[in-house]
Amino acid sequence: MRVIAWTPELTIGIADMDESHRVMVDAMQHVSHIGDEGFEAAYRNFIACVERDFREEEEVMELFPYPDARTHCEHHARTLSALHHSMGQVMQGDIASGRQALALLFQWFTVHIATIDRGLALARIAP
């Protein structure tokens, strides 16, 4: 499985969000290396980390006029829905579904930061 690593390209220029994203990358790395025995608990903790990150981003969106807030929140909601669905499968013993969701999230996360989150950062610093 390809493992995401923190790189300078993932920074968006909002210190709190960059740190939150770095924490999420660390959490992705951690859960991707966990064996099947500990995967369920690690994956549950990872999903909580994603929920926290999204909640914090959505709080930032409320602080200033951000025209793409609704779309951005919808991206978060769809992603969380998929993660919760895969968590249900993991709880039934289908660890492979959780690992597959994690692999897809690696790809989604880098694109989300480069496009949607970077747009949020630009809107925040716009005059």
Regions found by a protein language model. Give the residues of each.
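Small-residue-biased structural context
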Residues: 1-127
